Amino acid sequence: MSELKDCPPLKYYDFKPVDHVKVCPRYTAVLSRSEDDGIGIEELDTLQLELETLLSSASRRLRALEEQRQILTDWQDKKGDKRFLKLEKDPDLAASSRHSKPKKQKLDVKGSHGPGPGPGRPKSKNIQTKVQDFEFEVDPQDIPRNPKNDAPNRFWASVEPYCADITNEEIRVLEELLKAPDDEAEYYKIPTLGKHYSQRWAQEDLLEERREGARANDKKKSMMGPLSELDAKDVDALLKKSESQHEPPEDGCPFGPLSQRLLQALVEENIISPMEDSPIPDIPGKDDGAGTSPRSQGKAFSVPHTRSLEARIREELVSQGLLDSDERQGVGGESEDEVLAELQKRQAELKALTAHNRSRKLELLKLAREEMRKQELRQRVRVADNEVMEAFRRIMAARQKKRTPTKKEKDQAWKALKERESILKLLDG
């Protein structure tokens, strides 16, 4: 009974079993299936988490049982040490016991090789126990290991920057984003319309023919030199003239589409007799019989200031509400330039998107500055909380010593409370 009294107190843990149905529903469902059903790939992650839960529960049980077993082992070793010391203090008792009970001594010596205590064993056991204690303190099971499935850790690590406090560096980045870029005006420029492909091709064809003729007539190069220069000058003059006229339509009418539509609306129908019924007037020609060229005929019908007339008609129609103001027109008053219309459409969308982004950035900057102010107030609240707790500890220490708090301590406590209350009002406001 005395030995049982010396036994250190043991903890009888009440191990609560893991409810597989609630904690591990997927694991329970897989166990209830037949072998033919198998396990799906999408179930592996859930099964891994549930198996890790069961493993951690089993590890906790094993660690608790190992702790209690170690307590019993240490107690048994200490009891053996006490017997050994008692025999050393009473050698006569040890000698008489050896003479009176030789067989039992032999049995004890033989048994000393077993788990029971013996006269020569406790010291080695004590050393082994100390080694075990030392190893138990640095047991690798106690060292936290990274879980195999670190998806939650990676998720919170990715979310943490969005939940952290706003810094001055982030405010500066927002202010930099609000500045207009240097090349913003480049996106709203409309490039000038180049030469029409027919004009460019005609010029290229003429130049190609001239080069081929020059190669074919190397011997007559000196004779044809002045003429070729004159031809080049004529070609350049014709091209410049066509560019100045902005390529009038094939029918030779110098007026724009709006002017033509307006005149067609003002002219009454069926007032002109058919061409086959009207007599053809005689056109006096020159004696040499040379007819006029289409280019010379176009000169007779050329009217100056047609572009300004087209623009003025458009303005009047828009002001009278007969024409939409957002109708796009191309170069020369033509509204059939699809490339220009698409370019202007995309530029308008870009302007709207830029304005929307700028408004959102301004709103975000305003909210960020407001949050910075609140962060400073929260920091002041934490400082005020510490001051209130310090004053509370002083008052409680005075009461424990059965003395009344001094006026200074009370004033400090009231001051800390009022300051904290004022900061909270600012934070709520």
From Swiss-Prot:
Please give the biological process terms from Gene Ontology that the record holds.
regulation of transcription by RNA polymerase II
InterPro entries noted in UniProt: Histone_AcTrfase_su3 (IPR019340)
Per UniProt, what is one GO molecular function of this protein? transcription coactivator activity
**Which residue stretches belong to region Disordered?**
86-132, 208-257, 274-308
- What's one GO-annotated cellular component? nucleus
Q: Which domain of life is it from?
A: Eukaryota
Where do the coiled-coil regions begin and end?
Answer: 41-70, 364-404
Biased-composition ranges, Basic and acidic residues, are 208-221, 230-249
* This protein's UniProt keywords: Coiled coil, Nucleus, Transcription, Transcription regulation
Its main subcellular localisation, reduced to a broad class, is nucleus
Cellular compartment(s) = Nucleus
The entry's function note states:
Functions as a component of the PCAF complex. The PCAF complex is capable of efficiently acetylating histones in a nucleosomal context.
Q: Which PANTHER family match?
A: TRANSCRIPTIONAL ADAPTER 3, TRANSCRIPTIONAL ADAPTER 3-RELATED
Family label: Belongs to the NGG1 family.
Name the UniProt record assigns to this protein = Transcriptional adapter 3
